């Protein structure tokens, strides 16, 4: 995925009301740009952070600029636009770059599924094999207090993410393939695990989903201010939080 037109940069002043971000440009001008990320954005949104933003030519948009990339104090690039996770995942699947998700004839998006009025991010289909339901999650939280390069998801309590795990388990029980695909959009993350210290319920559901046969994949594209392209899978470390006797 190439950023076209090229991204512009500035310095973060503040993020507020979840979706708004004030940025000071190099010429001193201050602009307000849209932030698509509703999470805590820990380590991504500190005042003074160098940021890059895209510009839309859609005249109907109230805010034409969107926050795309942040640069951490350590020099890591972080894609904070959560919509990009689905976009790059789809592109990589169509390119055949995600080996476990190849071999399907059709790819559809936002298809209704499950028992809780959900829509699947990506649905892979092919004659003669089970459908493959893929939920995509964007990972940007780096916390190196326990291990260098350790990433976590979620960065805030996520009822929506819990619902998606339940839906994936329903699909697996119905005989389909169910995949939770973590798109790791922080260049400093080299391994990841569930954030039990932030959302223990979600971590428990991950353990239940693994036991039920849901596949967990963690893919880290190369994140830069010009493009995001294929790179590598990284390890996922389970927390083993299931209480004794849980199913």
UniProtKB/Swiss-Prot annotation:
GO molecular function, one term: DNA binding
Organism superkingdom: Bacteria
Family that this chain belongs to: Belongs to the SfsA family.
Protein name (Swiss-Prot/TrEMBL): Sugar fermentation stimulation protein homolog
Organism of provenance: Aeromonas salmonicida (strain A449)
